[in-house]
From Swiss-Prot:
It comes from the Eukaryota. InterPro entries: AB_hydrolase_fold (IPR029058), LYPA1-2/EST-like (IPR050565), PLipase/COase/thioEstase (IPR003140). Belongs to the AB hydrolase superfamily. AB hydrolase 2 family. Its EC number is 3.1.1.-. GO terms for cellular component: plasma membrane. Keywords: Fatty acid metabolism, Hydrolase, Lipid metabolism. GO terms for biological process: fatty acid metabolic process. This is Probable carboxylesterase SOBER1-like. The active site is at 151 (charge relay system), 205 (charge relay system), 237 (charge relay system). Coiled coil: none annotated. It comes from Arabidopsis thaliana. Carboxylesterase. GO terms for molecular function: hydrolase activity.
C-alpha cells in the first residue's frame, strides 16, 4: 500500500529542491546585498523584530538566506533573521536515506490523510522553541517574533507556533501540511491560538498536494486559530515572488500594529 506512494520519492524531492535553488539563485543574482558583515552584526544587536526561517526537506539554512534581501522596507531595518539548518536524519519517504530533515516524513506525495510522525516532530518543535526562548530572553518582545517555513519547514512552523505557550507575532506557512493528529489540539494554549497564521499554497503542487494545505483552514478554524489561506494557481512546489511580496505586506502590517501598541 505504501509502495504505490513511494514510487518516485527521489524525483519529487529533486524537483522540490531544484525549484527552491533556482528561485533563490534568480533573486539573489538580481538583487545586490549591500550590507557588510559588521552592519549585519550591528543590526542584530539593535533588533526589535526576529524572523526565523525554516527550510524544506533536504535543503539548508544558508541556501535560503538570500530571501532576506527581498525585504527592504524600513520596517525590516531592525530585524534579525535566522536561517538554521536541519540536522541529517534518515527519511522514510526516501527509503531511509540520510538528508537534512527536521522530522521524519513517512511518504510522498503528502495528502490530507498522510500518516504523521509526531515523535520526531515534537523533538524538532522543542528545538525551535529553544531558539525563540533565547531571542525573547535577549529582549525581543514575543509579539515581534515571526516563524516562516517552506514545505517541511512550513509544517514545523505550524506546530511550533501552535505548541508555543505564548502569543507571537505570526507564523507563515508555504506549501505545508498539518503534521500532527487532531488529538494534539488539546495542547494548544489560549495564547497560542491568538497567533495569526498565513498559509500560502500552489494549486499545482504535486509534492505536498493542494488538498493537504486546503485541509488546514477548517482544521485551524475549528481549533479557534485565525488563518488566512491564499491559493496560487499555476504554482507547483515552490515559493513565488508573488507569495513573498504578500508576506512582506503581511509582516509589515503586524510590525506596525505591534509598534503602535507598544
Amino acid at each position: 500500500m505504501r509502495t504505490s506512494r513511494l514510487k518516485k520519492p527521489i524525483v519529487l524531492l529533486t524537483i522540490a529542491l531544484l525549484s527552491s535553488v533556482f528561485f533563490f539563485a534568480f533573486f539573489f543574482l538580481n538583487k545586490s546585498d549591500v550590507s557588510s558583515t559588521s552592519a549585519l552584526r550591528n543590526r542584530d544587536s539593535m533588533a526589535r523584530t526576529f524572523i526565523l526561517w525554516l527550510h524544506g526537506l533536504g535543503d539548508s539554512g544558508p541556501a535560503n538566506e538570500p530571501i532576506k534581501t527581498l525585504f527592504r522596507s524600513q520596517e525590516f531595518r531592525n530585524t534579525k533573521w535566522l536561517f538554521p539548518s536541519a540536522p541529517p536524519n534518515p527519511v522514510s519517504c526516501n527509503y531511509g536515506a540520510v538528508m537534512p530533515s527536521w522530522f521524519d516524513i513517512p511518504e510522498l506525495p503528502l495528502t490530507a490523510g498522510s500518516p504523521k510522525d509526531e515523535s520526531s516532530l515534537l523533538k524538532a518543535v522543542k528545538n525551535v522553541h529553544a531558539i525563540i526562548d533565547k531571542e525573547i530572553a535577549g529582549g525581543i518582545n514575543p509579539e515581534n517574533v515571526y516563524i516562516c517555513g517552506f514545505s517541511q519547514g512550513g509544517a514545523l512552523t505550524l506546530a511550533s507556533v501552535l505548541l508555543y505557550p505564548k502569543t507571537i507575532g505570526g507564523g507563515a506557512v508555504f506549501s505545508g501540511w498539518i503534521p500532527f493528529n487532531s488529538s494534539i489540539t488539546n495542547q494548544f494554549t489560549e495564547d497560542a491560538k491568538k497567533t495569526p497564521i498565513l498559509w500560502s499554497h500552489g494549486i499545482d503542487d504535486k509534492t505536498v498536494l493542494f488538498e493537504a494545505g486546503q485541509a488546514a483552514l477548517p482544521f485551524l478554524q475549528q481549533a479557534g486559530v485565525t488563518c488566512e489561506f491564499k491559493a496560487y494557481p499555476g504554482l507547483g512546489h515552490s515559493i513565488s515572488n508573488e507569495e513573498l511580496q504578500y508576506l512582506e505586506s503581511w509582516l509589515k502590517q503586524r510590525m506596525q500594529s505591534s509598534s503602535s501598541s507598544s
